[in-house]
């Protein structure tokens, strides 16, 4: 359900925080310390797998949460849909696919920016490439990511493995983000920022920021 009387980014953050609370509030602190994880694979435990099933259902998938595919993109799509984005967001089961569609310029209010030059703002998506089982070699920089996204749009390349989190809180030198399938849960992570509010944390390979002014 969509919320009313608030900016879209506020609605999005409200949904992300609600889901994080539903999972019991697991966290990764800025020093890497983990808190609030009740099981190494929370996603496989009841009722958590049923929540994952809700995320899949939001993008029209028949997966019920007891399946193997990574569900972090489904989580992002669920949050946008619940916040009332409707057709203003490209709902897909893979981050690189929906980011490629955003990068096409066809989704007003959403744009892909260079993390080296762009301060984070509330409701932005912090995008990182990653490796993993059955993953092709991912881009290692914003420029490389832009090239790969163009190839995906032109159907000259397959999707690649990556991850997005929603920026939910900003402090001097720190950002809190919430994402799905982070250590097998919906997790709130604190990352380091520089003095200008740009991401400067070596725990992930950040290749883009989806600016969100919906």
Model regions and ranges:
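Short intrinsically disordered, low-complexity coil segments enriched in acidic
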Residues: 1-2, 123
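N-terminal capping segments
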Residues: 2-86
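A residue-level signal for beta-strand positions that form part of recognition/binding surfaces
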Residues: 9, 13, 174, 206
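...with weaker cross-activation on analogous glycine-rich loops/strands in unrelated enzymes
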Residues: 86-184
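Low-complexity, Gly/Ser/Thr/Pro-rich intrinsically disordered linker/tail segments
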Residues: 176, 181, 187-214
